[in-house]
Amino acid sequence: VNNFLQHITVTSVLSDDEKNLLSAEARFIRAMQYFGLVKRYGGVPLQTVPMEYSSDPTSLYQARDTEQSVYDFIIDECKKIYMDLPEVRSSDSKYQASRGAALALWSRAALYAGSIAKYSGVLTLTGEAVSNGYVRISESEAERYFTECYTASSIILNDMVPQVYSLYKTSSSDTDALAQNFYNLFSKAINGENGEYIFQKQYDVEADKGHMWDKLNVPFSYRGDGWGCGVSPALELVEEFEYRDGSDGKLKLKDETGKYISYDSPYDIFENKDPRLFGSIYLPGAPYKGTGGGNIEWIRGVIDGEDGIGTKYEATAQPDKENKVTINGTVYNTSGKDGGCLAVGDASKTGFYQRKFLDETMENYTNIDAKRSSTPWVVFRLGEIYLNRAEACVELNQHLNEALNDINEIRGRAGIKLLTASELTLEKVRRERKVELAFERHRYWDLKRWRKSHLDVSQGGLTNFRGTALCPYYNIKSGKYTFETGIPAKRIRLFTEKNYYTG
């Protein structure tokens, strides 16, 4: 990029307008790269001119810049270039950097910097990197950064909605329709043409530029001889999705007396949950709308008893192995076709599979190679910008009416109860980010910038996280299902303070 920017100024084959546009695109790419570095490592060397190579490699050594200066560079670059980028790209350049993309990067980078400034005081990190500012930003800078986020987000939300961008919506209030609408937003069928994507990465199988998301993540029984089962969402995430009436999302396994609740189908326990849950995650008993149809079957085992209490016979292997038990002459499967064992095999160990981004139009997952998927990947979308501004406003304790409207735009599209002014809290905004942006590569970085990753999972952090499974059991006497929770047999996650700056 630095070489390009140096040489484009002297070329005579481009007009000034063309030079300005191409320079802005190159500077956007450079700012994106620096954002990827600073969010991982803190301050890095800022190199904005070509390096001169010689036989002495020490001439290439450059000291780190401060974390604050790198964030300031990214924000300043976006502020300088966004007006040189087109508001709407032509069809032959629609996936290149636009005005909205530069504004979205400005919004996100400023929000990250504001959080790092505000919350880094909880860390006990010491040493030269801290004292020199290579890591950590002064708390006094937090307000400035949150204000920058508010400014960038407001240009998009006030000046470009609905003329350029709008939330992808359905007029229906039906849960299934709302769930399908949310799934469609990220689907291959829509292919990014949803009015909400600000910047996306497109793929082209015919040009040998595909990806392998579907090969890696299709549910077990639909994978043919493919791989599948790559992501097993945890019960902790499922329960973050509220009920449509706005009540807490914890699932009802037992009644107020402590008695197990029986359900006709494993799917019934999720009734009236936030429709985004159904659009994001395949749940036990959920209809599968891709090739093959049917339902997701994840059963932990069978019970010979009453009211969820009795002798349990549990799955001990993955679904295509022997998981059967004979009781009083009748043979029962102790596993569903999509899993049930917590310890071994490829199938989900939690009872859930990821639906968001999976291509349900793919005709056959058998023998799909590593580059046969082409669902686009979203980098920036309007939903994030609403949540960025809402968070910045709450952090500033300013513009709270705008924050309330922003979060209710997201909740309204989802089809769940809107918040009142008294319900608008930082915790609510953060939860909304967790469910709205699930699987879009935000959560890990959000926890890092809030300086919560090193905390124990019981305190909202990553340390000691293993992920809880939801375990449906089929009662052979009643023909109904009861639920328990379980812990998959996998390693505990650890995150120490030094991991904030190790990538």
Language model features with spans:
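Conserved, well-structured interaction surfaces
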Residues: 1-41, 57-99, 266, 271, ...
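Short, flexible loop/turn elements at secondary-structure junctions
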Residues: 50-53, 89, 203-205, 281-284, ...
